[in-house]
């Protein structure tokens, strides 16, 4: 007996599926390039925590293991004074910037920063079998260490994304008791300026997942360490968050400890054979290592050198939508923490209590860019595609969608500010809201830093040498060029006559 197939039949969509195209398909590049550079960018603060007085931060936290997310603001090229007015037609075209060159300059000497905790949860030194902790109520000790070494640079026209493990939600049908291991949840969020990088203890929310505040050093025990979500940014269909990235990481395990406290999930009896006498109790099996970034060398530096963007990893080939660019930098090879000392008295003899010790960390940056001027022809297909991708781009270009026809008659009062009529709806804000107003970035304004004289700047000269473009001609002096002398014609050689 015949019977129909039980497999599911998939019907294709009635309309063709929209395809994401690269920006090179509708963006025309010109031969006009500009150089832009920031001023010397400096940051000074305490490397472990911020100092507060009267609920006000007087000294910020500035650590060599923080993300530096620069929000670079560019001028509007459609309002730019161009050298040639015939480059584009404002009625049918719009101009955009394309980032083609970048150099992140780093000042300050190379150095290794040290972190630690005055009360670190260290029980046994499992690296050396003869060194063990004494059972007691509090076995925490003062331990210092250096962190994992990271160099990172990410460039895009949208903020980068980071991932970390946080505390998840328990199911309602699962009984929960005090001291149970919390469930984990992978959280993706925007990386902001000042967020901590992965130091070797994992990308996680230490404030929620380590309630004893003593399993990791003090600069991360109350915060969250994030790791760039490369998979999520690579899967971005439009490729705005990550044009390209540079990364270098290295770490090795330096010391090995275990944790004090009751083991929540003890070792099964099938895996061990208990001893006799004083070996009947099983020690803590919660092992942990202290990380180390090892040698810091100038031969393995990613910064202070130019990088040229020919082809991005996504569909956005360096176009700076919204006239902004996000540069995310991590450099732990310059994480030296300076120790400052101030005397309390003027005594001639040394006493520890006569001096106060302080710590500071300083950072120095310099950003240089090469931008290429590009044009977009405003056809119906291109405008529809840009509206689907990012409607705010068309709003910045003074384009909008016509509202549908309204069949109802609206009421408009003569006197709006009057107690005789009902309260009117508040008028909407005319200014465009900032989508990143609740996020923290280091804003770098380059609206007045553009220059077409590329040969006057270090990165511009490197670009001219690399690309083969010629700079502007040099200034001519008043010396008259000597006339070309005509060489006298060589005398013709007479042909010797021969007798026949």
From Swiss-Prot:
Query: Which keywords are on file for this protein?
Result: Capsid protein, Disulfide bond, Host nucleus, Host-virus interaction, Late protein, T=7 icosahedral capsid protein, Viral attachment to host cell, Viral penetration into host cytoplasm, Virion, Virus endocytosis by host, Virus entry into host cell
* GO terms for cellular component: host cell nucleus; T=7 icosahedral viral capsid
Cite the residue spans of the region called Disordered: 475-500
Q: Where is the composition biased (Basic residues)?
A: 491-500
Kindly list the biological process annotations in GO that this record carries: endocytosis involved in viral entry into host cell; virion attachment to host cell
The GO terms this record gives for MF are: structural molecule activity
- Any idea where this protein resides? Virion; Host nucleus
Top-rank taxon: Viruses
Against Pfam families, the record matches this protein to:
Late_protein_L1 (PF00500)
Gene3D superfamilies in UniProt: Major capsid L1 (late) superfamily, Papillomavirus
- Species classification: Viruses, Monodnaviria, Shotokuvirae, Cossaviricota, Papovaviricetes
List compositional bias (Low complexity) regions by residue number.
480-490
Q: What is this protein called?
A: Major capsid protein L1
Task: Provide the family line.
Answer: Belongs to the papillomaviridae L1 protein family.
Q: What does this protein do?
A: Forms an icosahedral capsid with a T=7 symmetry and a 50 nm diameter. The capsid is composed of 72 pentamers linked to each other by disulfide bonds and associated with L2 proteins. Binds to heparan sulfate proteoglycans on cell surface of basal layer keratinocytes to provide initial virion attachment. This binding mediates a conformational change in the virus capsid that facilitates efficient infection. The virion enters the host cell via endocytosis. During virus trafficking, L1 protein dissociates from the viral DNA and the genomic DNA is released to the host nucleus.
Its quaternary organisation is:
Self-assembles into homopentamers. The capsid has an icosahedral symmetry and consists of 72 capsomers, with each capsomer being a pentamer of L1. Interacts with the minor capsid protein L2; this interaction is necessary for viral genome encapsidation. Interacts with protein E2; this interaction enhances E2-dependent replication and transcription activation.
């Amino acid at each position: 007996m015949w019977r129909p197939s039980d497999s599911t039949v998939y019907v294709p969509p009635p309309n063709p599926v929209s395809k994401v195209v690269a920006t090179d398909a509708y963006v025309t590049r010109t031969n006009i390039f500009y150089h832009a550079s920031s001023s010397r960018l400096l940051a000074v603060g305490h490397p472990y925590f911020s100092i507060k007085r009267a609920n006000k931060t007087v000294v910020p936290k500035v650590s060599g293991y923080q993300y530096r997310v620069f929000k670079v603001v560019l001028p509007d090229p459609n309002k730019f004074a161009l050298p040639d007015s015939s480059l584009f037609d404002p009625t049918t075209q719009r101009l955009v910037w394309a980032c083609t060159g970048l150099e992140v300059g780093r000042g300050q000497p190379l150095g290794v920063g040290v972190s630690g905790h005055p009360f670190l949860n260290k029980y046994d030194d499992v690296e050396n079998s003869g060194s063990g902790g004494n059972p007691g109520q509090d076995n925490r000790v003062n331990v210092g260490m250096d962190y994992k070494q990271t160099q990172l640079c990410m460039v895009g026209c949208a903020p980068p994304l980071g991932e970390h493990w946080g505390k998840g939600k328990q199911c309602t049908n699962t009984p929960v008791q005090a001291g149970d291991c919390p469930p984990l949840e992978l959280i993706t969020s925007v990386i902001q300026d000042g967020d901590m990088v992965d130091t070797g203890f994992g990308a996680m929310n230490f404030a929620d997942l380590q309630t004893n505040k003593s399993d990791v050093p003090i600069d991360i025990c109350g915060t969250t360490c994030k790791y760039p979500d490369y998979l999520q940014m690579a899967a971005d269909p439009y490729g705005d968050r990550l044009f390209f990235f540079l990364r270098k990481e290295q770490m090795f395990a330096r010391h090995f400890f275990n944790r004090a406290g009751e083991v929540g999930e003890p070792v099964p009896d099938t895996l061990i054979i208990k001893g006799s006498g004083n070996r009947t109790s099983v020690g803590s099996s919660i092992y942990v290592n202290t990380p180390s970034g090892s040698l810091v060398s100038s031969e393995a530096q990613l910064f202070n050198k130019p990088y040229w963007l020919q082809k991005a990893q996504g569909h956005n080939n360096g176009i700076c939508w919204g006239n902004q660019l996000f540069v995310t930098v991590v450099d732990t090879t310059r994480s030296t923490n300076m120790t400052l000392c101030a005397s309390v008295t003027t005594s001639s003899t040394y006493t520890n209590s006569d001096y106060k010790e302080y710590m500071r960390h300083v950072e120095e940056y310099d950003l240089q860019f090469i931008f290429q001027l590009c044009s977009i022809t405003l056809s119906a297909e291109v405008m529809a595609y840009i509206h689907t991708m990012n409607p705010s781009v068309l709003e910045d270009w003074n384009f909008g969608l016509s509202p549908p026809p309204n069949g109802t008659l609206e009421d408009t009062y003569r006197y709006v500010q009057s107690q005789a009529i009902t309260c009117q709806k508040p008028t909407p804000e005319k200014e465009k809201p900032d989508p990143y107003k609740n996020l923290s970035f280091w804003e770098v304004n380059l609206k007045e830093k553009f220059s077409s004289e590329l040969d006057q700047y270090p990165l511009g000269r490197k670009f001219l040498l690399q690309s083969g473009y010629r700079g502007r001609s040099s200034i001519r002096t008043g010396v008259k060029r000597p006339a070309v002398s005509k060489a006298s014609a060589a005398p013709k050689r007479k042909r010797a006559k021969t007798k026949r």
